[in-house]
Amino acid sequence: MYKRQINGLIKEVTRAWELGIRCVVLFPKINDSLKTEDGAECFNEDGLIPKAIRILKKEVPEMAIMTDVALDPYSCDGHDGLVDETGNILNDETIAILKKQALTQARAGADFIGPSDMMDGRVGAIRTCLLYTSPSPRD
C-alpha cells in the first residue's frame, strides 16, 4: 500500500497495467481539515476517491478499480460509524451514509465496491441501493 498524489497514482497504475496487474484498490487518505463528525466528504462527488476513479478510467480505461466503503477515513474521531453523545454507534444512520458513499463511487466509475466497515447489515443495504438506484453515466 502506497500513499500517492493523483499524478503519482496515474503513473503507478499505468506501470501496474504494463506489468499485467488488472485491478487496483483505492483507499483514501484525506486532509484532516475535511474530516467531520458525519464523514460527509465520503460522498462528495468532487472528492479524492471519485476524482481519482474518473482520472484513472480516462488514463487507464481497462484497469478495474475497487474502492473501499467505510466512514473512518472521513470522520474526525476515526470511528467506522456515527457516534451519539453517549458513545454508542448509530448503525442505521451510518448505513445511510455508506450507501451514499458507495453510490458516489459507482457513479464515478468504480468496478467493485468493497465495504470494510463493521456496520451490521451494510452489505445488503449497499447492494440493494446499487441495484435499485440507477447510477448516472460515467464522465
Label each region the model flagged.
Residues 23-46, 116, 120-123:
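Glycine-rich, proline-tolerant flexible connector loops at the mouths of alpha/beta enzymes
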Residues 9, 68, 105, 126:
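Conserved, mostly hydrophobic/aromatic
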Residues 24-26, 65-67, 113, 138:
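Hydrophobic faces of well-ordered beta-strands that scaffold small-molecule active sites
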Residues 39-67, 123-134:
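Alpha-helix-loop-beta-strand connector modules within alpha/beta enzyme cores
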Residues 14-17, 106:
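Non-catalytic positions within long, well-ordered alpha-helices that form the structural scaffold/packing
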Residues 3-7, 82-96:
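Active-site mouth loops of central-metabolism enzymes
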Residues 94, 111-118:
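Catalytic beta/alpha-barrel core
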Residues 1-5, 132-139:
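Conserved small/polar residues in nucleotide/adenosyl-binding loops
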